[in-house]
């Protein structure tokens, strides 16, 4: 990771603290993963406070595949099985079946409908019958142990939400360039500066989480 590009956002610890503060306020955070992994940047919002405006920004500037990162416990509560029985994804991304709110949505694809689906899924005492399957929101099952167990955006979203005092759930989408290519470090840094989003790396989060368990 080009540390000179990230230094303008502070030290590793400062970047994490700013990300947590942003999450506490319900704001978005840009998370970069390892260069030898996906080498992508995701815009992440706490699911508990996601707004229609924020969802619209995810759809506009992202890949269009908006994912809801949740715990294994919530997946079981909602009876969300894996999307496939044999996951051959190189990064073992744990998609479940896609979902839609059973009530209160039209086609399910609009920003408003996707926010409604997320609100239904993470509601207290949410039940399997509250959701239709398939749908336009893609849940991701976070690995227990967070980024210390798996260095992925899924775990980063759940960890950040937990550290910020929210329900352990985050909404993520990969940021793309205007030409449709994936945004890398330089583009993510520029995107963060343009929209005033903190930028943090998975490595930053791993260091922070490690220091919390020592």
Swiss-Prot record:
Q: In which pathway does it act?
A: Cofactor biosynthesis; riboflavin biosynthesis; 2-hydroxy-3-oxobutyl phosphate from D-ribulose 5-phosphate: step 1/1
Q: Which Pfam families match?
A: DHBP_synthase (PF00926)
Question: Could you tell me the EC number(s) of this protein?
Answer: 4.1.99.12
Residues annotated as binding Mg(2+) 2: 38, 153
Which of this chain's residues are annotated to bind Mg(2+) 1? 38
Family, similarity comment = Belongs to the DHBP synthase family.
Q: What protein name does the entry list?
A: 3,4-dihydroxy-2-butanone 4-phosphate synthase
Organism, by scientific name, is: Histophilus somni (strain 2336) (Haemophilus somnus)
């Amino acid at each position: 990771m080009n540390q000179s590009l990230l230094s303008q956002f502070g030290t590793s610890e400062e970047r994490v603290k700013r990300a947590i503060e942003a999450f506490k306020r319900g704001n978005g955070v840009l998370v970069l993963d390892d260069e030898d992994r996906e080498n992508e940047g995701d815009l992440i919002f706490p699911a508990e406070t996601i707004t229609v405006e924020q969802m619209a920004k995810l759809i506009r500037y992202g890949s269009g595949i908006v994912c809801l990162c949740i715990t294994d416990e919530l997946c079981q509560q909602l009876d969300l099985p894996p999307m496939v029985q044999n996951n051959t994804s190189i990064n073992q991304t744990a998609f479940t079946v896609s979902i839609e709110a059973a009530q209160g949505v039209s086609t399910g694809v609009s920003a408003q409908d996707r926010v409604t689906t997320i609100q239904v899924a993470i509601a207290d005492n949410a039940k399997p019958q509250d959701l239709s399957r398939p749908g336009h929101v893609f849940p991701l099952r976070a690995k227990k142990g967070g980024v210390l167990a798996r260095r992925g955006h899924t775990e980063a979203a759940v960890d950040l939400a937990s550290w910020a005092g929210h329900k352990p759930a985050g909404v993520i989408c990969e940021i793309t360039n205007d030409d449709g290519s994936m945004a890398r470090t330089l583009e993510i840094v520029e995107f963060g500066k343009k929209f005033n989003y903190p930028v943090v790396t998975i490595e930053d989060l791993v260091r922070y989480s490690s220091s919390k368990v020592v």
